[in-house]
Amino acid sequence: MLPALLCDSELYATQLPTLTDLADPLVVTWAERDMARAAALVLERGPARFVLAGTSAGGNLALEVLAAAPARVAGLWLTGVNPGRHADPDGARLMQQRVRAGEFEAVLDVLAARCVHAAGARADEALGVLRAMARRAGPDVFLRQSEAVITRRDRWDVLTGLDVPTLLLWGREDAFASVETARAIADRVRDARLVVVDDCGHLPTLERPEACVPAVRTWLIAVAERALGAPLR
């Protein structure tokens, strides 16, 4: 599991305990300045074959892993991912400049407000958790991760014809990657299931944590059944 920018395992805190009967979840935090290098480190840590989950920038990293070693990926879960190149690199560079100038907290406020759907039932709690994760990561991690995000390659190609069970778990009010983007991904993947979570922005596992559990479990069961060639009993 590859968390979003400035996030760690707390992004999946509600889901992790509910999945241990189906998988052995491992959350890999990353802080490389280059997606290809980050992907190489993920592959070094992973088993011969694994299922892959990525949220936002972690989803871009997941696609880089998939590009590097497609035969090792048995299933894919993406949330809030734009598979193309960065939509606003100049704006992202300005954010980096502000952080270098000591304005990390101000930049965090901007990012957090855009990540979390303000009208959501758990918006305040989600914002608190997001800020806590970001402060644990700190400005240096932000600068390294954001460099990887800004310079990432277009990875739409790795999705075309992808034939592993794929979950697209999306917040309906996602301000970074629209539901239309998720539908475009689903159109390219042979075995995709799109689940749109209402009352939710960019981080469904944080904003609507309980609502995500059934979708993730259903996806993991599909992965297991594909591997076994038979339904789970």
Named regions from a protein language model:
Residues 1-36, 40-41:
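Conserved HGGG/HGGXW glycine-rich cap/lid loop of the alpha/beta-hydrolase fold
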Residues 5, 172-174, 199-201:
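Acidic beta-to-alpha connecting loop that harbors the catalytic carboxylate
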Residues 54-58, 62:
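Gly/Ala-rich beta-loop-alpha elbow adjacent to hydrolase catalytic centers
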Residues 179, 183-202:
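Catalytic histidine neighborhood in serine/cysteine hydrolases
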Residues 200-213:
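Catalytic histidine-centered segment of alpha/beta-hydrolase-like enzymes
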